[in-house]
Amino acid sequence: MEFPTHPIQETGKRPTAMLDRNLSYLSLVEVLYGYPIDGVILTTGCDKTTPAALMAAATVNIPAIVLSGGPMLDGFYKGKLAGSGTIIWEARKLLAKGEINYDEFMDMAASSAPSVGHCNTMGTASSMNSVAEALGMSLPGCAIIPAPYKERKQISFETGKRIVDMVHENLTPSKIMTRKAFENAVVVASAIGGSSNCTTHLSAIAKHMGIKFNLSDWQKLGHNIPLLVNCQPAGEYLMESFFRSGGVPAVMKELIKNKKIHTNLMTVTGKSITQNLIKKIKVNPNVVKTFKNALADKAGFLVMRSNFFSTAIMKTSVISKEFRDRYLSNPKHPNVFNGKAVVFEGPEDYHKRLNSKKLNIDENSVLIVRGCGPVGYPGSAEVINMQPPDRLLKKGINTLPTLGDGRQSGTSASP
């Protein structure tokens, strides 16, 4: 039996995509509760599909496996890798500088989507499918197999066979998605340079599983984990290269080697993580790093609190050397930046007034967008992706510190 779910695709559903995640969850729960279904394969892809599926699996608690549709092939523009999402932010800046025209902008954007599949960067789609695998809810290696590859068809077939066995074994999500499994997911998400949206989604999945899990766990468990995957936006490569270098299993083996994740946990295979990862994996050291040659020593999320917000998340893996040198180089206070706050009342106001000379935005300004949270804007929208005014971009200032009460794109390198 096949059945659809509520459709979700971030850019097509903005600003309501987070609400659509919950609608997708509800539609899945109604079908899984309302029909005599013994087990389910949850097909996922773009950003919100995976958390919606895992939330439903947690609520209904019948045998379930997550089967990702897989990322697109690597894209190229003028001989260089073109990552979905990341190249859009780059193209927007080039257009603002006047270095490309609109037709060239569209060519750049189109180059990042060379095939079927979800985003080929380590955006929210690849991050959440990797998290599903880290939780033990996908067959090993499933998350990053490119959509057009024959291996994607093979793992789909294996997933179909396995769900039948899981029904007979009564292997349910509650036996797999334990507290320790969520701890593993945080560590893996940090090591791969995962999307900041993982924090929101994983907390929601845990809540539906009845597990106490909050934002402070992200810093406690993940902040000191090194960046092991050299993929955009935190690195250089894309998902096709990550797959060829062993994918999530390669990262988990390195984490096991350094005793950073729990190994004796049940997975959808009916085996433990250790048993799943017995085979030797051929790794490209340029793509998947070891602890000794990691891209960054600390790649996890920082949880911040202040007198004007209760909690905030910073994705440290995308903070560039240029940004650190410019804003975070005070030897007395290396993680403190002092600057003028420029406040916008929502993304519409930001786009309308960003280039206004009256605001006097300079390189020592902090861009703030407010009114975009769960209450003030539909479902905490993904609209906190801000770039400097055009005149600063033309001077070579490509980033400013930003702050907002909504969410950022998983492909954004905006600090």
Residue map of PLM features:
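Catalytic or ion-coupling anion/metal-binding cores of large enzyme and transporter domains
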Residues: 2, 11-17, 50, 56-62, ...
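A short, small-residue-rich loop immediately preceding and capping a beta-strand
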Residues: 33-53, 64-68
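N-terminal small/polar loop signature for handling phosphorylated ligands or for N-terminal nucleophile
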Residues: 2-35
